[in-house]
Amino acid sequence: MKYIPSIGLEIHSELSTKSKIFCDCPVSFGGEPNTRCCPVCTGMPGTLPVLNKQAVEYTVIAGLALNCKINEFSKMDRKNYFYPDLPKAYQISQFDLPICKDGGLTINTPDGEKFIRIERIHLEEDAGKLLHDNYDRYSLADYNRCGVPLIEIVTKPDLSSAEEAKEFVEKVRLMLLYSGVSDCRMEEGSLRADVNVSIRPIGTDELGTRTEMKNINSIKAIARAIDYEINRQSELLNEGKKIIQETRRWDDSKGESKALRSKEDAHDYRYFPEPDIVPVTFKSEDIEKLRKSLPELPDKRFERYTKTYSVNQADANLLLTSVSLSDFFEAAAAESGNPKQAANFIVVEVLRRLKDSNMSPEDIPFDGKLLARLLRLMDSEKITPNNAKKVLSEMFETGKEPDTIVDERGYKIINDTAEVESMVKEIISSNEKAVGEYLEGKEKTFGYLMGQCSRALAGRGNPKVVQEILRSELNKLRDIDINVH
């Protein structure tokens, strides 16, 4: 029997505030265990939380970026459960009145555009981290992450495949990055996702029993986990077995999931309003002020790149994968006056060097304006495209200005036609066999002769000029040959 998957996501994103959500402990990745926590974030008796205003504003900004409505009245709640990484035995979160609700994003699918609804975005504190791997009989708790402000983005079960989920998570990641509320470093755990999967037979509308897989921290792993769970549930139903509502742990190294516990419902957590924090209220003018502070988001940039700059869609998407790369392109495009050329050069040459050097766009040792100067040197035919690539490599190694490298390396194009003509004649006289084949009609030998000329001129000959002079000299020989016969 064939089944239709229904997939919902709970995307957790740590906010890029300087301090934690209820205390002034710093928010930063790593550090010695239990050195970035205090009595407040570890829940010591007698301590009181103070809500971080910036965390609240970042939640609103994230909601606006994801097309949500903002509740002018919301509150914090206690979510009660026991786990060693939660020292208070409850998490301060939001239950029935989240800050953001009713949003969504449009993604591209093979069948066209599809709108994925976001049910809510709520603000909460992150838990600590348990370390299991190197210990046989016990686990260690690191509370550095305790109290880091976190938003949870909860979708409706609108996704139908692993590919759609990948597309959606990547788009959310970009929205959060460009809006400046999170660094979204999945490898550091600042962006992770829980995946809810159910399947139902084709022709039925009632959703099946769902399972949840927790804390998946890469987009590829999210896709693998979804595919695995769809196959697992399909096999169970085909064997006449029931699917149990449960929470499962995804092991990406083994490519499988294992049952952790039965899936909890909201009443299991015994939510009640947090008595130590006043409700969060907004005026409409506060929300509008934050809306106006939003930078240009990826969808708008994509539209401008493709329509105004005539950049093809594939290149535009590549340029938008990083805020730093997009800003680098913006600077190069503005300075060079030729956005399409700048986009092509960045996508082909700059990205190749980043990949070869295992660097990220943030590591580029020069700005977009310097790249534009290199492009202008090439446009004005002061250097050849080949030498432009050499200059780019040296810019990556040294950070020097392109004009300096051109002068130091002697890369300037030879514009003296007499010098080029003299060199071409030498090449013709020293390559009698190739010249003879060309005169006999073997056009491909012309490319060989062009290569010889380029080497003789150390790559500094203007290709158009060299080609014209070489053809002219060869045609003279052909005319002589015709006249002789």
Swiss-Prot record:
Alphabetized InterPro entries for the sequence: Asn/Gln-tRNA_amidoTrfase_suB/E, Asn/Gln-tRNA_Trfase_suB/E_cat, Asn/Gln_amidotransferase, Asn/Gln_tRNA_amidoTrase-B-like, GatB, GatB_C_1, GatB_Yqey_C_2, Gln-tRNA_amidoTrfase_suB_CS
SMART domains tied to this protein: GatB_Yqey
Entry keyword Nucleotide-binding: yes
One Gene Ontology biological process: translation
Catalysed reactions, as listed in the record: L-glutamyl-tRNA(Gln) + L-glutamine + ATP + H2O = L-glutaminyl-tRNA(Gln) + L-glutamate + ADP + phosphate + H(+); L-aspartyl-tRNA(Asn) + L-glutamine + ATP + H2O = L-asparaginyl-tRNA(Asn) + L-glutamate + ADP + phosphate + 2 H(+)
Enzyme Commission designation: 6.3.5.-
Record's function text: Allows the formation of correctly charged Asn-tRNA(Asn) or Gln-tRNA(Gln) through the transamidation of misacylated Asp-tRNA(Asn) or Glu-tRNA(Gln) in organisms which lack either or both of asparaginyl-tRNA or glutaminyl-tRNA synthetases. The reaction takes place in the presence of glutamine and ATP through an activated phospho-Asp-tRNA(Asn) or phospho-Glu-tRNA(Gln).
NCBIfam families attached to this UniProt entry: gatB, PRK05477.1-2, PRK05477.1-4
Stated family: Belongs to the GatB/GatE family. GatB subfamily.
Protein name listed in UniProt: Aspartyl/glutamyl-tRNA(Asn/Gln) amidotransferase subunit B
Organism name: Ruminiclostridium cellulolyticum (strain ATCC 35319 / DSM 5812 / JCM 6584 / H10) (Clostridium cellulolyticum)
Species classification: Bacteria, Bacillati, Bacillota, Clostridia, Eubacteriales
